[in-house]
């Protein structure tokens, strides 16, 4: 009976510890998701956020690399290549030693599935992003 009680106490302690460790991840995800959603808003039509609002979440190097003119050109390229965004859904949050990655899966008028990946530093600033169409395997013809 004592062994059973001790096992239950140890199990409860392990569960409580895992909840405590996840609290920091939740805070980071919340901040990073806000930045990513501002980026998504810049591609989904109306109302378009101002570049200053979108770039507020950029780190210094990304701000140098992507100015307002370059960002406007990026919006045009995305619209030309993928079409208009219909919807975007949160997909994954990955933590690494030096950076975190937040991925959304979006649907556009010209591309059914686009993976929108956002990389963040440990200060929750956006350092890089990539939009990649996901090719679905073609269904084999029935014989």
Annotate each PLM feature.
Residues 21, 54, 117-118:
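Short low-polarity hydrophobic stretches
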Residues 95-143:
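Exposed beta-sheet edge and beta->alpha loop/turn motif
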Residues 18-45:
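Short, low-complexity N-terminal intrinsically disordered segments enriched in polar/charged residues
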Residues 7-17:
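Bacterial N-terminal signal peptides
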Residues 1-5:
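Positively charged n-region of N-terminal signal peptides that target proteins for export
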Residues 51-97:
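Short solvent-exposed beta->alpha transition segments
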